[in-house]
């Protein structure tokens, strides 16, 4: 199947486009491809579908109105973020080191400690919040990301910390490095379409069912040589630039400004994928 992320491919779908006042070029340029029925089009990136076009309407404005979180609408490099199974071992995610906005909370353990007086009624546990990069400010349910300084409050019981971090601060380097572009794009795409009157949205928190003991499998242990040289827990998957040492996990990589191996200043990091 042709790649509909490409404008040229989308344009080819408008061969029998029936709307004279909106050119195929305009529609394709705004991320849409023609579904081949009536005047229905779909965004190749967020999957929102729009129909019943009226003269004078602006495809770009309508796209933003109905799917404000669409990565195409927001100008994210959606084409460059797709990873295929054929080239994953050669794929890297690059982030320039700016430094954490709150160095005091660069380490996960410090973020966990900040939640010592976190309201007990909150469904989000301190470990979950800290893992997603947040520390507690000490007021209400106000939290902030240690790296991008993004603040979130008014947490709902069903809110997942990582998903909320992505939805509101998708450009955060910590988010991009730890979760990866595929996860970021997935969360954004799922959130970008506004619920319609026929859309059912689940608000219930997931319920964990007990797993029979016989089905529990031990996770394979990481070889000592591959353990992060900062936390000694996670696997090394980040390469420091310019020295080239792969000695840190994604969570720890942004907590240091010097390579722990050679002590050279780190200017950027690369997330590496091993086949």
Curated annotation (Swiss-Prot):
List the PROSITE patterns hit by this protein, alphabetically.
Answer: BIR_REPEAT_1 (PS01282), BIR_REPEAT_2 (PS50143), ZF_RING_2 (PS50089)
Tell me a Gene Ontology molecular-function term this record carries. Answer: zinc ion binding
Annotated zinc fingers (RING-type), start-end = 228-263
Q: Which domain of life is it from?
A: Viruses
Question: Which residues hold Zn(2+)?
Answer: 145, 148, 165, 172
Q: Which GO terms describe its biological process?
A: negative regulation of apoptotic process; positive regulation of canonical Wnt signaling pathway; positive regulation of protein ubiquitination; regulation of cell cycle
Which ranges of the sequence are coiled-coil?
none
Q: Which UniProt keywords apply?
A: Apoptosis, Metal-binding, Repeat, Zinc, Zinc-finger
Q: Which Pfam families match?
A: BIR, zf-C3HC4_3
| InterPro entries associated with the record | BIR_rpt, IAP, Znf_RING, Znf_RING/FYVE/PHD
UniProt xrefs under SMART domains: BIR
BIR repeats located where?
Answer: 7-73, 108-175
Q: What does this protein do?
A: Acts by blocking cellular apoptosis rather than by preventing viral stimulation of apoptosis.
Protein name per the record: Apoptosis inhibitor IAP
Q: Which organism is it from?
A: Cydia pomonella granulosis virus (isolate Mexico/1963)
